[in-house]
Amino acid sequence: MELFKGQSLLEFTERFKTDLDCEEYLASIKWEDGYCCRKCGHKKYQVRKDFSRTCNICGDTESPTTGTLFHRLKFGLRKAFYICFEMSTTTKSLSASQVARRYEISRQTAHYFMQKVREAMKSSESHKMDDLGFQSLI
């Protein structure tokens, strides 16, 4: 499955230089149709520096990664984006050991995250992809 159709590694690296770039992208997709507080349902909010949204009424803060496969990562969001990119554009199968070495994370963490990505890819096969493909993974 080609999640990044027409997307070269160079274009990808230019787009996602920092974890904040990744958070900004996730926020733009997550709240594309507007924000609604998950606790009280209010629609007015403040945007924080990390692109999180804080409800004006109850003060609940929601991160762009909450409720996505990137929630509670034990490594940087940029690394996670790169792993997703590699998994979706590589023709050969990647092992957790390879990913662990390449991205300097533990084998167990690599295995767990790769499982989450594979599940998201399976469940999104019938959904339309956006230009980078993450929308269907979120």
Language-model regions, residue ranges each:
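Residue-level recognition of single "structural anchor" positions
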Residues: 1-138
